[in-house]
């Protein structure tokens, strides 16, 4: 899988790029996924327009049928928008590193693009287990503060 990372914020995301690429590299699918880092204002705008929820959220996923970055490529899986400020806030709240939070949100968005949902407790547990499995492969366990 090819990961294309876009930064639409003033925050430095360079320290996270190699982890994100390493995390998705083992996936043998010949698709492109765009990870777009945005502000709370931008993600709130997207959340309001597409989900009718007028507040900032941490991560949003859009399949390639929408005209963001993914809409420009035939072999695109989709776009994952991550609010960098929300990731910072959640890392503090959950008492783990920003690296771990960003990785978690990227994996969460990826799984949504692959069709996973968490509308029921069963779906939530399946998705959580998959997230943990992917994070463990790069040394970021859900129960660790790394």
Swiss-Prot record:
* Any GO BP: rRNA processing
Highest taxon above the source species: Bacteria
Q: Does the keyword section mention Zinc?
A: yes
Keywords of this protein's UniProt record, alphabetized? Cytoplasm, Endonuclease, Hydrolase, Metal-binding, Nuclease, Ribosome biogenesis, rRNA processing, Zinc
* Segments traversing the membrane: none
Q: What is its EC number?
A: 3.1.-.-
Which leading EC class covers this enzyme? hydrolase
Compartment(s) where it occurs, according to its Swiss-Prot or TrEMBL record: Cytoplasm
Cofactors named for this entry: Zn(2+)
Q: Which InterPro entries match?
A: MetalPrtase_cat_dom_sf_prd (IPR023091), YbeY (IPR002036)
Q: Name one GO molecular function term.
A: RNA endonuclease activity
Summarize where Zn(2+) binds, as residue positions: 108, 112, 118
Give the cofactor binding note: Binds 1 zinc ion.
- What does the function comment of this entry state? Single strand-specific metallo-endoribonuclease involved in late-stage 70S ribosome quality control and in maturation of the 3' terminus of the 16S rRNA.
Q: Which family does it belong to?
A: Belongs to the endoribonuclease YbeY family.
Name of the protein this chain belongs to:
Endoribonuclease YbeY
